[in-house]
């Protein structure tokens, strides 16, 4: 603690001092509200709504509203908010992050700001990490909200559009970050406004905010359709990768990448029968080889992914859960499928995408809760404008956190851990053991079996039994091995007689690269003032120590002449570990910041497209816009074709008319001879007059009302098609940006500049295609209004955790020979699919 903090207190304590008078005000209503009947208490909700309608603010009514929610909670749930929970609730209402330790009742805390903000009628979203927790919290807390006259909904994976709309229209809606994000994307792909499900994004409370806004920040949400690329080349590239020897490639563990050596490049040129592997023409080969190398030499089975039912499934590195339905992007998933010799799925095409960073920044007010946020305080402030307030615990923490024990080898470390578990088991003290991978869990499990220690294993392979196992983990004599405990969401309550033997003992088998994940594991013990104990066991062979800890530490151990059996506990070692973790956290922050800088370019473009889509959906007449598009397309065509040279005048006019005949102009309506005596401006006028006259005739033929609907459907269809292609193009542009840094060019600035040019090209393409389709479309008078309820496949789990790979949902693909959904009556391939 610095001198400033010693004198003035920490930032959190200074901020909490400002909140205490509001807490005292809330307390002052207690006796009065206890005397109210249930009906009188319930009527307070309507009174508050009236006060807001008459100009009062949420802050004006906060003390009284919190007091009402507190009294209602005591009556309905049998739980009365402590003063610390009131502080947490105020911090959330202020749009900040409440850091509250495990077992301090975060779910109950959220009811206070949720109730207050729901009174405005604009909706409150409570985000949890999985469907199970969303349903559990909604079921429990809807009793309280219902008592106070508010409605509660929950968004889970298998709801249809009608059920989703109903849930979003409730006063308070629970759900996962994935579901909310996907619904936002789908709402911006609909053709009719009635198909949208979300309201405007108002106030959001994110539970486990560090997991969602930090761990998953590198994870774009992607809605995808099937691409056209063949999968055969993945098998060829995999075969090549498997023929390589160790000196044909180098593995960079820090960046998790593999590159061919000179010798490897020679082998590639020979294998693929090419002269120069680095040639731009061979980018396709390079891409497949890079992914095959990564799949074979950095991606580990049962650590990064599992093969289950002949399918490759990603394992979440933060929670150890299986992430069914998610796929690695950029062909890596297909490369792993080739490596494991399972069916290779086709690459997909991105239809819509957004990062969590940009989704959550759209809320008018954002807040969050977690047990561990302080280590990432700078990132919360810089990226989201959120500050972290540490809320004091209701009872003092009685857990003992022992210093780390360091062994020379991993083998010696695990032997010591097993001995420690066996000793603890003898006195019937429950033990929770945290591991970093499924592989390590199973190794430890085998060692404990040989030692005769009964235990439970909790990891991705068995997560169906998860809640059941966790509910018993605090009972006498229980030994539970768990892959990373982040986001488990279930408290471990101590069984009878456990306090007497020292509470829950937590053993970490390795330091995670994030201090926060270590703190989460520690925090499982010692909840609500319970006794407890935690300790981490580390070896110099652990990934974190091997890759990031300094060589100096290795030197110290050598000098001490430690044998495999010896262990050291020292401040220097603990500092070295913490510095290694800070180094990794810094690297990860830089990566997330870089992702955001690139995504901000896409985000500005996305906002323009989605805003215009929204205006079209809201039924604003497009007639003037379409006429402006017609004028713009014709003017630009004339400017592009007319060189101003007399000797090429006739040729210029012939090319101009041929070009416009493709778009709208019937043959022989106007001739080169008629136009060659006119100025460019007069030519524009003649051609625009013809177009406007033709358009008026088409409108009369189908009725103005029907024409407005056709304009809307066609414009949306073309915008969507062009936007999807633009997303792909921007993705390719971004992949090429790494080379710009070598040319002394700022890659982000280059991406911004070129991306802006590509966006302008896309807008011009939208105008031209819209005009072209509107002139060419043949409309059947009685054609039924198009319904485009886009269905996504349901192969995605509730999406916990934070893989750094895109989360994808799949869209149904329109067949080339199906009728075009735009209502033209033509086959898709001859209409919008051209």
Swiss-Prot record:
<dbReference type="InterPro" id="IPR004027">
    <property type="entry name" value="SEC_C_motif"/>
</dbReference>
<feature type="binding site">
    <location>
        <position position="85"/>
    </location>
    <ligand>
        <name>ATP</name>
    </ligand>
</feature>
<dbReference type="Pfam" id="PF07516">
    <property type="entry name" value="SecA_SW"/>
</dbReference>
<dbReference type="InterPro" id="IPR036670">
    <property type="entry name" value="SecA_X-link_sf"/>
</dbReference>
<dbReference type="InterPro" id="IPR011130">
    <property type="entry name" value="SecA_preprotein_X-link_dom"/>
</dbReference>
<keyword id="KW-0479">Metal-binding</keyword>
<keyword id="KW-0813">Transport</keyword>
<dbReference type="InterPro" id="IPR011116">
    <property type="entry name" value="SecA_Wing/Scaffold"/>
</dbReference>
<dbReference type="InterPro" id="IPR014001">
    <property type="entry name" value="Helicase_ATP-bd"/>
</dbReference>
<feature type="binding site">
    <location>
        <position position="822"/>
    </location>
    <ligand>
        <name>Zn(2+)</name>
    </ligand>
</feature>
<keyword id="KW-0862">Zinc</keyword>
<feature type="region of interest" description="Disordered">
    <location>
        <begin position="790"/>
        <end position="809"/>
    </location>
</feature>
<dbReference type="Pfam" id="PF01043">
    <property type="entry name" value="SecA_PP_bind"/>
</dbReference>
<dbReference type="GO" id="GO:0046872">
    <property type="term" value="F:metal ion binding"/>
</dbReference>
<dbReference type="GO" id="GO:0065002">
    <property type="term" value="P:intracellular protein transmembrane transport"/>
</dbReference>
<dbReference type="GO" id="GO:0005886">
    <property type="term" value="C:plasma membrane"/>
</dbReference>
<dbReference type="GO" id="GO:0006605">
    <property type="term" value="P:protein targeting"/>
</dbReference>
<comment type="function">
    <text>Part of the Sec protein translocase complex. Interacts with the SecYEG preprotein conducting channel. Has a central role in coupling the hydrolysis of ATP to the transfer of proteins into and across the cell membrane, serving as an ATP-driven molecular motor driving the stepwise translocation of polypeptide chains across the membrane.</text>
</comment>
<dbReference type="InterPro" id="IPR020937">
    <property type="entry name" value="SecA_CS"/>
</dbReference>
<comment type="similarity">
    <text>Belongs to the SecA family.</text>
</comment>
<dbReference type="GO" id="GO:0005524">
    <property type="term" value="F:ATP binding"/>
</dbReference>
<dbReference type="InterPro" id="IPR036266">
    <property type="entry name" value="SecA_Wing/Scaffold_sf"/>
</dbReference>
<dbReference type="Pfam" id="PF02810">
    <property type="entry name" value="SEC-C"/>
</dbReference>
<dbReference type="InterPro" id="IPR027417">
    <property type="entry name" value="P-loop_NTPase"/>
</dbReference>
<keyword id="KW-0472">Membrane</keyword>
<protein>
    <recommendedName>
        <fullName>Protein translocase subunit SecA</fullName>
        <ecNumber>7.4.2.8</ecNumber>
    </recommendedName>
</protein>
<dbReference type="GO" id="GO:0031522">
    <property type="term" value="C:cell envelope Sec protein transport complex"/>
</dbReference>
<dbReference type="GO" id="GO:0005829">
    <property type="term" value="C:cytosol"/>
</dbReference>
<dbReference type="InterPro" id="IPR000185">
    <property type="entry name" value="SecA"/>
</dbReference>
<dbReference type="InterPro" id="IPR011115">
    <property type="entry name" value="SecA_DEAD"/>
</dbReference>
<keyword id="KW-0547">Nucleotide-binding</keyword>
<feature type="binding site">
    <location>
        <position position="831"/>
    </location>
    <ligand>
        <name>Zn(2+)</name>
    </ligand>
</feature>
<keyword id="KW-1003">Cell membrane</keyword>
<feature type="binding site">
    <location>
        <position position="491"/>
    </location>
    <ligand>
        <name>ATP</name>
    </ligand>
</feature>
<keyword id="KW-1278">Translocase</keyword>
<dbReference type="Pfam" id="PF21090">
    <property type="entry name" value="P-loop_SecA"/>
</dbReference>
<comment type="subunit">
    <text>Monomer and homodimer. Part of the essential Sec protein translocation apparatus which comprises SecA, SecYEG and auxiliary proteins SecDF. Other proteins may also be involved.</text>
</comment>
<dbReference type="InterPro" id="IPR014018">
    <property type="entry name" value="SecA_motor_DEAD"/>
</dbReference>
<dbReference type="InterPro" id="IPR001650">
    <property type="entry name" value="Helicase_C-like"/>
</dbReference>
<keyword id="KW-0067">ATP-binding</keyword>
<keyword id="KW-0653">Protein transport</keyword>
<dbReference type="GO" id="GO:0008564">
    <property type="term" value="F:protein-exporting ATPase activity"/>
</dbReference>
């Amino acid at each position: 603690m610095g001198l400033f903090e010693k004198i003035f207190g920490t930032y959190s304590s200074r901020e909490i001092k400002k909140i205490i008078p509001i807490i005292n005000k809330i307390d002052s209503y207690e006796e009065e509200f206890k005397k109210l009947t249930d009906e009188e208490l319930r009527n307070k909700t309507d009174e508050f709504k009236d006060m807001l309608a008459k100009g009062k603010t949420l802050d004006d009514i906060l003390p009284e509203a919190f007091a009402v929610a507190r009294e209602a909670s005591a009556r309905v749930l049998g739980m009365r908010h402590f003063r610390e929970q009131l502080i947490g609730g105020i911090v959330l209402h202020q749009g900040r992050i409440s850091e509250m330790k495990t077992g301090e009742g975060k779910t109950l805390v959220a009811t206070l700001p949720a109730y207050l903000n729901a009174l405005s009628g604009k909706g409150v979203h409570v985000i949890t990490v999985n469907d199970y927790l969303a349903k559990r919290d909604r079921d429990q807390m809807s009793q309280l909200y219902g008592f106070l006259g508010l409605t509660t909904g929950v968004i889970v994976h298998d709801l249809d559009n009608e059920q989703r709309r109903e849930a979003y229209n409730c006063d308070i809606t629970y759900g996962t970050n994935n579901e909310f994000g996907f619904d936002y994307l789908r709402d911006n792909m609909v053709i009719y406004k009635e198909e949208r499900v979300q309201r405007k994004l108002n106030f959001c409370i994110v539970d486990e905010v560090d997991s969602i806004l930090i761990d998953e920040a590198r994870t774009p949400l992607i809605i995808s359709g099937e691409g056209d690329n063949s999968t055969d080349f993945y098998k060829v590239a995999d075969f090549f990768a498997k023929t390589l020897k160790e000196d044909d490639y180098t593995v960079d563990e820090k960046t998790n990448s593999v590159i061919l050596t000179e010798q490897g490049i020679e082998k590639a040129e020979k294998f693929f029968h090419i002269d120069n592997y680095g040639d731009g023409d061979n980018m396709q080969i390079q891409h497949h080889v890079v992914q095959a190398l990564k799949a074979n030499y950095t991606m580990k089975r049962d650590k990064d992914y599992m093969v289950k039912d002949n399918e490759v499934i990603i394992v979440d590195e933060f929670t150890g859960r299986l992430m069914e339905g998610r796929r690695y992007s950029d062909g890596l998933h297909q490369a792993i499928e080739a490596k494991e010799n399972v069916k290779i799925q086709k690459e997909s095409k991105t239809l819509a995408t957004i990062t969590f960073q940009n989704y959550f920044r759209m809320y008018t007010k954002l807040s969050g809760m977690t047990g561990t946020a302080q280590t990432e305080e700078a990132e919360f402030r810089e990226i989201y404008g959120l500050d972290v307030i540490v809320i004091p615990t209701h009872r003092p923490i009685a857990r003992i956190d022992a210093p780390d024990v360091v062994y020379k080898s991993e083998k010696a470390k695990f032997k010591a851990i097993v001995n420690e578990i066996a000793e603890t088991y003898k006195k019937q003290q429950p033990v929770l053991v945290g591991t970093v991978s499924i592989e390590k869990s199973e190794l430890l499990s085998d060692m404990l079996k040989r030692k005769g220690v009964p235990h439970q294993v909790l990891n991705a392979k068995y997560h169906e039994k998860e809640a059941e196992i966790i509910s018993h983990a605090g009972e006498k004599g229980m030994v539970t091995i768990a892959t990373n405990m982040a986001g488990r969401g279930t408290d471990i309550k101590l069984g009878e007689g456990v306090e007497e033997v020292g509470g829950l003992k937590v053993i970490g088998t390795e330091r995670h690269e994030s201090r926060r994940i270590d703190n989460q594991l520690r925090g499982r013990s010692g909840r609500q003032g319970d006794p407890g104990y935690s300790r981490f066991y580390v070896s110099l062979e652990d990934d974190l120590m091997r890759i990031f800890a300094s060589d100096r530490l290795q030197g110290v151990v050598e000098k001490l002449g430690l044998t495999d059996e010896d262990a050291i506990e020292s401040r220097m070692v603990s500092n070295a570990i913490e510095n290694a973790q800070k180094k990794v956290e810094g690297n990860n922050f830089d990566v997330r910041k870089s992702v955001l800088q690139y995504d901000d370019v896409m985000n500005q473009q996305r906002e323009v497209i989605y805003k215009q889509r929204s205006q079209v959906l809201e039924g604003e007449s497009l007639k003037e816009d379409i006429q402006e598009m017609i004028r713009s397309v014709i003017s630009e065509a004339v400017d592009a074709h007319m060189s101003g040279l007399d000797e090429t005048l006739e040729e210029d006019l012939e090319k101009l008319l041929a070009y416009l005949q493709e778009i709208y102009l019937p043959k022989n309506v106007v001739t080169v001879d008629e136009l060659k005596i006119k100025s460019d401006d007069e030519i524009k006028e003649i051609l625009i007059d013809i177009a406007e006259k033709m358009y008026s005739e088409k409108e009369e033929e189908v009725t103005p009302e029907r024409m407005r609907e056709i304009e809307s459907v066609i414009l949306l269809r073309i915008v969507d098609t062009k936007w999807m292609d633009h997303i792909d193009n921007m993705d390719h542009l971004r992949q090429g940006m790494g080379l710009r840094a070598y040319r002394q060019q700022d890659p982000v600035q280059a991406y911004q500049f070129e991306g802006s040019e590509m966006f302008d090209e896309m807008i011009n393409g939208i105008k031209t295609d819209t005009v072209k389709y509107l002139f060419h479309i043949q409309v059947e008078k009685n054609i039924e209004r198009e319904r485009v309820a886009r269905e996504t496949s349901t192969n995605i789990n509730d999406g916990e955790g934070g893989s750094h790979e895109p989360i994808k949902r799949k869209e149904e693909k329109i067949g080339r020979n199906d009728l075009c959904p735009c209502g033209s009556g033509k086959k898709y391939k001859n209409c919008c699919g051209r």
